[in-house]
């Protein structure tokens, strides 16, 4: 009751409505104002009376031209009295210093410790200022539509349309604007201030305040709101960012705000425990040698996720055993290569049946979330250059999505290099034509040729050269749907000499272009070499047999085709093969690669051919019994055929 009467007297004696009486459990709403130091008005002098001392209150001038009055209880420190008033304004005692205004000396003030007994200051005027070495700026708000998943840093609710500070990254709804902290702080500098108070004080010329102690830091962490312990975004509690200075010693000007929610971290990690942060700080304070300081940034993050992007050379020296600990940690999402998510552990794939082997590897049927095809490549002990080149090509292959392309599902690098693709129940085109001798009709053969050209046109649009185009790598999936496989992978289909990649003739001899056989260029593979191989596939479709079947010597075929002495015999094409298809086969297997058409032209030619094929139109007089509205409308006698009438 005495506190209430004292507060009322204080207000009635001239403090006005702008002053607030603060209790330890009271709370007021902060407002967004321009940031500049508070200046006392001349009218404020002399307003204090002896009633302030009798009411156990202290008048405090705060930054950003704000002021308040707090009640003092016995046993409370200055930190305890002002903590609530600072917190609701988005301020931290660790960022501020408190001074006692000297009444006998106008304009002078004496610095106080945050641990000072507040009872000894009853009736005094205090002033809270920002520390000189705490970088402060005004907010730079801009309206923003958040297309990616985002949450308000005030109410923690979903945020679509709102505002965002361009400097510190603080984002909020429009109706939450009154609760935004008034100061805009580079929190990476605050981390330096907390962890290296001695160096910071020496640089700025201001002695470090005694409140910067481990006990104060632990108290600040322990007072973290319960809601913020489950989220990584809170403007009222410090999060220790591990962004380190660059080699020039200057901090980045656009550090990511600690108030921005890390949604992917929330879904994959446990809530932040304050004890983890305390242990990290304690381990840092105990390490006094430079080598210990160089390895400490990896341990400062409570989740172990943040890593410096440009580490200084001293940070590369790691303590023994740190490598094994880092292997057990989850790699940070921001630092991961995108191909990381496509790498499959060998223990997750179960190999069953061996399907066959080729010049570049062996294919197995396996189980990995269903049936898959696993091609183990014939690369023994890959060098780091080969492994990196393999990953680079996998990064291209994983972006392929087409109805006529085998779906790439992942890759493996442990023990052996392997590619995992979708499993096709159907057989290859080679098996259909030359083993099972399936009899396709002409329109089916033309449709297979069209789908193959369509898939190759897609690969070339992605700048992927197949290098091994043949009927063995064309699969008929679920009927007559064409799937092209074993494309790309120049790393595997080339010969390596040390760290240098050397091109060599690859693929089966019958489908190799003359310039590939000759190997006169450093890289003879091109879009036209794929067109030649496609022309041989067209020859297989339109003849049902392989080219050069009259030559049994492989070396002779290589010599004659490479020299230009031999070419596929076009007289063996089917008699009912359209003339446009015959011309297309002849154009694709031309000896000069510049004279061969590219796949956009090939695809348009086949599509025109399909439209020009004669079709049997449906007879207008043919009865459509299934279209009848009611079965009783159809006379039953019309459904029975008289034996005297001929049946057509």
Swiss-Prot record:
The modification Phosphotyrosine is found at residues 340-341. Residues 275-285 have a biased composition (Basic and acidic residues). Its main location: cytoplasm. One of its GO terms (cellular component) is nucleus. Residues 331-349 are annotated as: Interaction with PEBP1/RKIP. CDD domains: C1_A_C-Raf (cd20870), RBD_CRAF (cd17135), STKc_C-Raf (cd14149). Residues 349-609 form the Protein kinase domain. Residues 239-271 have a biased composition (Polar residues). Regulation is a highly complex process involving membrane recruitment, protein-protein interactions, dimerization, and phosphorylation/dephosphorylation events. Ras-GTP recruits RAF1 to the membrane, thereby promoting its activation. The inactive conformation of RAF1 is maintained by autoinhibitory interactions occurring between the N-terminal regulatory and the C-terminal catalytic domains and by the binding of a 14-3-3 protein that contacts two phosphorylation sites, Ser-259 and Ser-621. Residues 56-131 form the RBD domain. Phosphorylation at Thr-269, Ser-338, Tyr-341, Thr-491 and Ser-494 results in its activation. Phosphorylation at Ser-29, Ser-43, Ser-289, Ser-296, Ser-301 and Ser-642 by MAPK1/ERK2 results in its inactivation. Phosphorylation at Ser-259 induces the interaction with YWHAZ and inactivates kinase activity. Dephosphorylation of Ser-259 by the SHOC2-MRAS-PP1c (SMP) complex consisting of SHOC2, GTP-bound M-Ras/MRAS and the catalytic subunit of protein phosphatase 1 (PPP1CA, PPP1CB or PPP1CC); this relieves inactivation and stimulates kinase activity. ATP binds at residues 355-363, 375. Binds 2 Zn(2+) ions per subunit. Belongs to the protein kinase superfamily. TKL Ser/Thr protein kinase family. RAF subfamily. This is RAF proto-oncogene serine/threonine-protein kinase. It comes from Rattus norvegicus (Rat). The lineage of its organism: Eukaryota, Metazoa, Chordata, Craniata, Vertebrata. The gene is Raf1.
